[in-house]
């Protein structure tokens, strides 16, 4: 999986009750809470903020008429963005006749029944429902290796379509 280091910035508004000697610590804590684990459509998933002790916080400015202060906070972050053609390991979350859904960390992936190997058939009578072949079973909780064939990016989420119809892909 390709991870990236990126310099990012965020404007944080601060209520006057937080002004004081611990203001820098509060801004750092707010940055970590607001950014880590989120998804930016432009950059991908923000996994973590690096060097949290050396985050660059500018002097800030008071917003006229409100009393709030705005601070521009610059930080380095580890990002993950899925790419078409990337081979990944996933955990199956839902199985139905149309295909199955799986999670790759925070990323939701759909594998259509047309992108499952032809020897694997959907068995709706099984408990839980699954796709089964000669020696493989795909059911909720199964670990599978997939290849991403397409991604769709929204403002706060990334969704992917994947396949299992290639060599070395399938149930692990």
From Swiss-Prot:
Subcellular location: Nucleus
GO CC, any one term: P-body
Entry-linked InterPro entries: NA-bd_OB-fold (IPR012340), RNA_pol_Rpb7-like_N_sf (IPR036898), Rpb7-like (IPR045113), Rpb7-like_N (IPR005576), S1_domain (IPR003029)
Alphabetical GO biological process terms: nuclear-transcribed mRNA catabolic process; positive regulation of nuclear-transcribed mRNA poly(A) tail shortening; positive regulation of translational initiation; regulation of septum digestion after cytokinesis; transcription initiation at RNA polymerase II promoter
Mutagenesis or variant effect for residue 166 to A: Reduced interaction with seb1
Pfam family name, one: SHS2_Rpb7-N
Record key words, sorted: DNA-directed RNA polymerase, Nucleus, Transcription
One GO MF term attached to the UniProt entry: single-stranded RNA binding
SUPFAM superfamilies linked to this entry: N-terminal, heterodimerisation domain of RBP7 (RpoE), Nucleic acid-binding proteins
Role summary: DNA-dependent RNA polymerase catalyzes the transcription of DNA into RNA using the four ribonucleoside triphosphates as substrates. Component of RNA polymerase II which synthesizes mRNA precursors and many functional non-coding RNAs. Pol II is the central component of the basal RNA polymerase II transcription machinery. It is composed of mobile elements that move relative to each other. RPB7 is part of a subcomplex with RPB4 that binds to a pocket formed by RPB1, RPB2 and RPB6 at the base of the clamp element.
Entry's family note: Belongs to the eukaryotic RPB7/RPC8 RNA polymerase subunit family.
Subunit relationships: Component of the RNA polymerase II (Pol II) complex consisting of 12 subunits. RPB4 and RPB7 form a subcomplex that protrudes from the 10-subunit Pol II core complex. Interacts with seb1.
PANTHER family (alphabetical): DNA-DIRECTED RNA POLYMERASE II SUBUNIT RPB7, DNA-DIRECTED RNA POLYMERASE II, III
Record protein name field: DNA-directed RNA polymerase II subunit rpb7
Organism: Schizosaccharomyces pombe (strain 972 / ATCC 24843)
């Amino acid at each position: 999986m390709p991870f990236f280091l990126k310099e990012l910035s965020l404007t944080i508004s601060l209520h006057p009750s937080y002004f004081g000697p611990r203001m820098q610590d509060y801004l750092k804590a707010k940055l970590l809470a607001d950014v880590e684990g989120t998804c930016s459509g432009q950059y991908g998933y923000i996994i973590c903020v690096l060097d949290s002790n050396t985050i660059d916080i500018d002097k800030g400015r008071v917003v006229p008429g409100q009393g709030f202060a705005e601070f521009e906070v610059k930080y380095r972050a580890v990002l993950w963005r899925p790419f078409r053609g990337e081979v990944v390991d996933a955990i199956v979350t839902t199985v139905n006749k149309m295909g199955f859904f799986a999670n790759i960390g925070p990323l939701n992936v759909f594998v259509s029944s047309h992108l499952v190997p032809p020897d694997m058939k959907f068995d709706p009578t099984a408990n839980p429902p699954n796709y089964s072949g000669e020696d493989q079973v795909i059911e909720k909780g199964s670990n599978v290796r997939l290849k991403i064939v397409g991604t769709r990016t929204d403002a706060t989420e990334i969704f992917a379509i994947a396949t299992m119809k290639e060599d070395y892909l399938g149930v692990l």
